[in-house]
Amino acid sequence: MVTHSKFPAAGMSRPLDTSLRLKTFSSKSEYQLVVNAVRKLQESGFYWSAVTGGEANLLLSAEPAGTFLIRDSSDQRHFFTLSVKTQSGTKNLRIQCEGGSFSLQSDPRSTQPVPRFDCVLKLVHHYMPPPGTPSFSLPPTEPSSEVPEQPPAQALPGSTPKRAYYIYSGGEKIPLVLSRPLSSNVATLQHLCRKTVNGHLDSYEKVTQLPGPIREFLDQYDAPL
């Protein structure tokens, strides 16, 4: 499958081609935010650029629940969409970009604060459960829109409370679980090593102890996924 993104691919060394883009940037800072997001997404290995919702559904159809990908949004009001395989099929969640941050589009009736991040990768990582976290499901509820909601989850004995996230869609309340990205290309050994290192750098002090070239390489992609 050959697709063409509305964003340039060559290291983001040139400005975004506004003729290929639908959503208008609200400011120079938002432009730079999206430029940085695209650069990191292109290195992530699970950015599928211009695939459509139907194509994303086909790509994820044979994958287990929890498999996900990021693609360009087909909605002119948004830049990116998170497509995820759930226990009820593939769901597409728009990623909002406003106020200098990214967030998943949520139910406007929700009173819960929406997590916001300066990077799409950080957003994705936030919704990924820690290793060993059990999965769960809920019975159907009244219909609502296909947007995430985040009521508190029950804590396991001896553990701290964690927040669970759900998608309301087609009369169901579906747990939002991001467990494995769907790779669009083969990652280099350098990138795999970088992700591993990022996952073990839990303090700023550890980063500053690394040689300058390594710190710069890690800064270019500062996520463990």
From Swiss-Prot:
Organism whose genome encodes this protein: Mus musculus (Mouse)
Function field: SOCS family proteins form part of a classical negative feedback system that regulates cytokine signal transduction. SOCS3 is involved in negative regulation of cytokines that signal through the JAK/STAT pathway. Inhibits cytokine signal transduction by binding to tyrosine kinase receptors including IL6ST/gp130, LIF, erythropoietin, insulin, IL12, GCSF and leptin receptors. Binding to JAK2 inhibits its kinase activity and regulates IL6 signaling. Suppresses fetal liver erythropoiesis. Regulates onset and maintenance of allergic responses mediated by T-helper type 2 cells.
Protein name: Suppressor of cytokine signaling 3
Domain SH2, chain residue ranges per copy: 46-142
Sequence ranges assigned to domain SOCS box in this UniProt record: 177-224
Subunit structure as annotated in this protein's UniProt entry: Interacts with multiple activated proteins of the tyrosine kinase signaling pathway including IGF1 receptor, insulin receptor and JAK2. Binding to JAK2 is mediated through the KIR and SH2 domains to a phosphorylated tyrosine residue within the JAK2 JH1 domain. Binds specific activated tyrosine residues of the leptin, EPO, IL12, GSCF and gp130 receptors. Interaction with CSNK1E stabilizes SOCS3 protein. Component of the probable ECS(SOCS3) E3 ubiquitin-protein ligase complex which contains CUL5, RNF7/RBX2, elongin BC complex and SOCS3. Interacts with CUL5, RNF7, ELOB and ELOC.
Tissue: Low expression in lung, spleen and thymus. Expressed in Th2 but not TH1 cells.
A GO term for molecular function: protein tyrosine kinase inhibitor activity
